[in-house]
């Protein structure tokens, strides 16, 4: 199985490279950009790893992601993004503008699953929440904890490289992906009317291996 560190790094690199294809820039120095991305990842890796472990240890079910959303909102505000919380109940939207150009949406999912964790990890979840009327163990069994950590890392990388692109970045945290409903709730709450309508949208999903 691929290590968490490898998944964080490789997913972050892949997403930033994909974003680079969508935003206008001057002459493209691919090798130079990859080196800059790697430097940014290396500089923030210990912080992102700690964020991942914190999120993993404190999972929350769909539309109950209050701690998770607040944690990510604080991270994005600290980076300088303009953040709106409570979009679609527990969703968040974080925006930064960097001159003229397309609006790029980057999405992560926020919720966990109603399952007991049996990994034995030192940061394993001991959380429980109400699911279908019963107190139930909860864990991040589908990689959303990694998705969120990568999402924050990419937000920082794009700021570090802002002299190499132009446009608007719109980072969204979607609640209730498991079982559905979260995306519709955000759209119904004005995701594409209260905020810039994206020209492109990106997301990722890690694999088990």
Task: Set out the residue ranges of the language-model regions.
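A generic structural signal for short, non-catalytic loop/turn and secondary-structure boundary residues
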Residues: 10-14, 99, 197-199
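Bacterial N-terminal signal peptides
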Residues: 10-24
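Histidine/acidic-residue-rich, glycine-tolerant segments that coordinate divalent metal ions
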Residues: 128-139, 145-146, 163-209
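Bacterial N-terminal signal peptides that target proteins for export
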Residues: 1-13
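Hydrophobic alpha-helical segments, especially transmembrane helices
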Residues: 8-10, 53, 145-148, 206
């Amino acid at each position: 199985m691929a290590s968490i560190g490898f998944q964080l790094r490789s997913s972050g690199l892949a997403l930033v490279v994909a974003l680079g294809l969508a935003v206008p820039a001057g002459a493209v120095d691919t090798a130079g950009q990859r080196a800059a991305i790697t430097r940014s990842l290396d500089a923030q890796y210990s912080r992102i790893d700690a964020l991942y472990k914190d999120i993993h240890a404190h999972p929350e079910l769909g539309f109950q992601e209050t701690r998770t959303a607040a944690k990510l909102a604080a991270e994005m505000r600290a980076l300088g993004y303009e953040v709106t919380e409570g979009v679609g109940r527990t969703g968040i939207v974080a925006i930064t503008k960097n001159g003229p150009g397309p609006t790029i949406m980057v999405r992560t999912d926020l919720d966990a699953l109603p399952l007991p964790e049996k990994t034995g990890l030192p940061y394993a979840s001991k959380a429980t929440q109400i699911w279908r009327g019963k107190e139930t163990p909860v864990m991040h069994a589908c990689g959303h904890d990694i998705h969120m950590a990568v999402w924050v890392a990419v937000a920082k990388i794009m700021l570090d490289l802002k002299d190499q692109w132009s446009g608007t970045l719109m980072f969204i945290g979607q609640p209730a992906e498991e079982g559905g409903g979260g995306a519709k709730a955000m759209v119904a709450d004005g995701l594409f009317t209260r905020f810039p309508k994206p020209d492109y949208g990106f997301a990722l999903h890690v694999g088990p291996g």
